[in-house]
Structures are given as C-alpha cells and as structure tokens.
C-alpha cells in the first residue's frame, strides 16, 4: 500500500475511534511503531468495538462513544465469547467458503487488544500520575499457537531459501536473464526500475533486514564506504547493520540513477523511491513484496522478502556456526529464535554427507 493511501486509511479509522485509542495511537507513534503496524491495530480495534456494540456489551450508538468503563469491566467470559465469534464468523471480502478466521488472524487481534490494554492499565498516566484503570482482562485470555517442531518448520522453509550459489545466481538471473522473456512494453518498465529492484533484493540478501526496515531507510542511513546501514528495529530501537560486500555494486548502481530516474529532490529523503506522474515517493512494503515475488517465482519459487531474511541468516550461521552473531545481525535480543537456522544447516550437512 502506498504511504499516502496508508495515511488516508489511518485517518479514516482515527476519525471513528474513542479518545483513549487516539491517545494510544499518539503514544505508539512516538516509540515509533510503524504506520503499517498502527493501521493493522486500528483495524483490529474497529473489529472489536463493532462486536461490543453488536453483542450489547455497550449501549452507545457509535464506536467513539465507547467509554473506558466498558473496557475495564469486561470479563474473561466476554473476551472468550469474542474469540468464539472470530473463530466462527464467515470470512469477509473473500471467495472462501471456510467459516471463521485463521488462528493467526485471531492471535493478531488479541495481540492488538493486549497492547491497548497494557497501555491503558500500565503505561498511560492521568492527571494524578496513575493509569486509566488497573484491571487488565487480556492477561487472562490465552492464545493458541500453531504447533510445529523446529525440524518441521526448517524443512518447510528450506525449500524457499536461496542458499549457497543460489544467492548470487538469483541476482544474476534478474540482472541478465529475466528481461529476455519480456515483451517490448514490459522491457521498458523493467529497465526503468532494474537498478532499484536489484539494489533492494541485494540489500535484503546481504543484510537480513526486515521489509519494514528496508522500506523506512533514508539516504542518510546508508554508508556504502563502511557497508553499514542504520535501521529502526522493532520496539523503536536504532541499530547499525552490517551489509555483505556483494551488495555494494548493486547499491552503487541504483544511487547513480536514483536522482535522475525518479526525479528526486533534496526533500525526498527515502532511499528506495518510486515515481508516479512525475512525483517521487517512498517505495511501500506491498510493492516490494510483489516485486520480490515476481522475480523469485520466475527464478525458482515465489518467496517473500522475509524468506530472503531467512536466507541471509542461514548462510551466516552456516559460515560462522554462531547463533549469537546471527541474532545480532537480525536484531534479536536472544538466540532462541535462531535455533531454526541450526536445524536447516544441520540438515544440509547431512545431505552433503549422504552424497559423499
């Protein structure tokens, strides 16, 4: 979604929200939470508030009138009824005949509500320096996580990684072969964005940054001499990230055409730009996802930018055997989340031994 459209949608949701949700939004914007995250949270709050009114748990005529007392006095049974509603309601805006939302979507909804309740009961201060209320019913609501062993997850992910020589082969394919299959009209569009697209893919493969971190990069955040970029991690922490040397040429080629190709002026701070009707804009997450999916599907298998992050992490662990180093590269505070890469690498080693 383009940034301008995203901000428009956010304003639409803000216009119907209670005052305390607007306080929450302002507080999290200062962290900073990304606009994408806040947009998703606002959608979840609307879903929840709509249900409160439909279930007669509040007698007000519109969402903006739902008061703090309503949230304070909701019971565990009320929230469990909401979860059951989510699990059984028909999916909207889809051709699927499947009843109910996925567990992943339900967990996302509950996560958004937990964040709001934590803000209202712990983080915010009223005139007396106290939170708005103390009872956090969300602490009593359990979430169900998908059960899957690390070995099983590693096996599923491994097929979607560009390991070994495939990392550079993927870049080389986009650079030299992809164009050959295109019509003359499609070639024109491809050539316009070729350097930018290659720079994005190379950066993801060479640094392992999250999609949101790549989207939010500004020119000042990129140091090609040191091959270091500055990013805002989850939770608003600023971090310096090393970038593998193979990405340097692609990034330099993009920078050489960025100003002329995308009509960038001094006020256009975003590193990765797109141009629409002569106006440069920051490239958004959905456009990058589609771009990565398009090229990767033609090369081998359709993947997301997050799989390129997994690719970097797996290759780095394979080269160093250090979970601590991989955790630091990815911006994780613990090595627990990097256990996945040990399973992938160990499986690769076993396959290599079997072929001896």
From Swiss-Prot:
It is found in: Cytoplasm. The active site is at residues 210, 234, 306, 309, 332, 341. GO terms for cellular component: cytoplasm. Residues 169-354 form the Tyr recombinase domain. FtsK is required for recombination. Pfam families: Phage_int_SAM_1, Phage_integrase. Its main location: cytoplasm. The keyword Cell cycle applies. GO terms for molecular function: DNA binding; tyrosine-based site-specific recombinase activity. One of its GO terms (biological process) is cell division. The keyword Metal-binding does not apply. SUPFAM superfamilies: DNA breaking-rejoining enzymes (SSF56349). InterPro entries: CB, DNA_brk_join_enz, Integrase-like_cat_sf, Integrase_catalytic, Integrase_recombinase_N, Integrase_SAM-like_N, Recomb_XerS, Tyrosine_recombinase_XerCD. Residues 16-121 form the Core-binding (CB) domain. Keywords: Cell cycle, Cell division, Chromosome partition, Cytoplasm, DNA integration, DNA recombination, DNA-binding. Site-specific tyrosine recombinase, which acts by catalyzing the cutting and rejoining of the recombining DNA molecules. Essential to convert dimers of the bacterial chromosome into monomers to permit their segregation at cell division. Belongs to the 'phage' integrase family. XerS subfamily. PANTHER family: PHAGE INTEGRASE-RELATED (PTHR30349), TYROSINE RECOMBINASE XERC (PTHR30349:SF77). HAMAP family: Recomb_XerS. This is Tyrosine recombinase XerS.
